[in-house]
């Protein structure tokens, strides 16, 4: 599991009136190992789930040859205070896989403690692994820590998408959550190639200042980790897609050591930001796999 920032360590010391942190139903675990032989389909070799996570099986609906989809289900209706959920996915040599969720993740209002959503992604030589969950909706007074750790081989590719939506867009004032922190760290052969964070704590500073999200509400991020790809070509292909998205402001940055690109999208509507992130994902797919993304049929 990724390191926990000091602020969230202090939150974690707060007692809960209901089930404690890591208690029954609050310690969600999902583990999966995938492998592929030659040009055959990618197979799920091993999986383990612990409530509230559930996996019905794999889906073979992706247009990319040999790529299998894991749609992770969570029937509890959202994430509550004290929840600690972790995902670990390993794609062995040559495997191709996409991990998604059945819907958005709703982080409910809190009175104490915090919720932690942690993901560890490992991609072996020539593997292609995508982690593209639904948006994260953070409600009033909620504290949410999201951490993603990536370890990939030089010939592997890993794509990670994230869309943050403040719950105030529907019922109350935007940015009235307590604390939201999302961080990704990626390593290739033990070298740190990407370290990025979105840390929003309205009590310490207005998220709408010009140096943060300005007049926007929704934050979308896409990481395309591809050490052997042409970073300049990849960035240009993604950037060209944003010409068709007038409702958002977006940018593309090259990662250190020519290990890929990161994309940030800002908007006022979650649908606009999600569409732009999906378009950027599609552009990266075309460059890396020669085929576009699948239709969004999770619902």
Swiss-Prot record:
It is found in: Cytoplasm. The keyword Ribonucleoprotein does not apply. InterPro entries: UreD. The keyword Translocase does not apply. Required for maturation of urease via the functional incorporation of the urease nickel metallocenter. UreD, UreF and UreG form a complex that acts as a GTP-hydrolysis-dependent molecular chaperone, activating the urease apoprotein by helping to assemble the nickel containing metallocenter of UreC. The UreE protein probably delivers the nickel. This is Urease accessory protein UreD. It comes from Natronomonas pharaonis (strain ATCC 35678 / DSM 2160 / CIP 103997 / JCM 8858 / NBRC 14720 / NCIMB 2260 / Gabara). The gene is ureD.
